[in-house]
Amino acid sequence: MNPVVAVAFVGVSLRYTKVLENVGAATLAVETAREPVAEVDEILSATVLPEPDIPVGLPAPGEVSFEGVSFGYDQARPVLHDVSFTVPAGGLTAIVGPSGAGKSTLFRLIARFWDADSGTVRVGGVDVRDQTTEQLMSQLAMVFQDVYLYDSTLTENIRIGCPDATDEHVRQAGALAGVDEIADRLPGGWDASVGEGGRRLSGGERQRVSVARALLKRAPILLFDEATSALDPENEAHVEAAVTQLRQTSTIVVIAHKLDTIRSADQIVVVDRTGRVCQVGTHDDLIASSGRYADLWHARERAVGWSLVGRP
């Protein structure tokens, strides 16, 4: 090749290399964004659930009931089958069962994130479909296993539970959930920023903040979705102490894998792998009946003290 042509070819190649790199990067960015954009589009195009214009009277405050409820996220895969049980007002009801049985789905139907395919979900004695969103949400406080905190202060993240609360009330609720210990550790105390998503706090500490929100809201019904399953003993103790406080004033419904934490529940609802309620009763009653709950309990007892043993 003629040296002049070779130099010209190299010069042109170098000129367009950056352009081609930018095109490749842009293509990758478009492909990466395709799935999130599709998810946002799905959310925006979701059908809005109908609701009444005005609140209705609640004949049974603090009570939750399922009456012949069946539900599936799609028609081909039903999750719940003909579920019926009542959560009495003012007590602690625990829901137990294997993973994938539909326990968290029960909570989502209580909060009306979806409507049941058949049957009726009642909160406060009234079908959730006959309540305004504001009325329904005012009765519920929810504590989930995965907690998201905003890039704001400890105080403001707790105040979300009750926007009109004073700083004093926020700190009282925080103290009951053990958040005061977190405030003492952080530079800035109660005014310290927790970072986006609460990244400056551990998972257990974020859970305490979430419980403090629920304490501050003082809702008639509290839903705990496996809130202590991944906590260390110290954080778990703080959360359980806060639940004891809430138990004095609220109806508590808790999903639990740790059966020893719900022995004192007023009622235990057992859900099997098919999404059906197979047992309802107290711990002692269910142990005596030798059913699914007893199997789970005895499996837990066999696992106590289990440890990995290294090779000699």
Language model: regions and residue ranges:
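Cytosolic ends of transmembrane helices, especially the final helix of ABC transmembrane type-1 domains
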Residues: 15-43
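Primarily ABC-family ATPase nucleotide-binding module
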Residues: 44-93, 115, 127-129, 168, ...
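ABC ATPase nucleotide-binding domain
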Residues: 83, 133, 137-140, 151-152, ...
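The feature captures the beta-strand-to-loop junction immediately N-terminal to the Walker
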Residues: 96-98
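ABC-family ATPase nucleotide-binding domain "signature/switch" substructure
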Residues: 105, 138-146, 157, 173-179, ...
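Helix-to-loop junction immediately C-terminal to a conserved catalytic motif
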Residues: 111
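Conserved post-Walker A/P-loop segment of ABC ATPase nucleotide-binding domains
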Residues: 114-122, 164-165, 264-265, 280
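Conserved ABC transporter NBD signature motif
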Residues: 119-126, 136
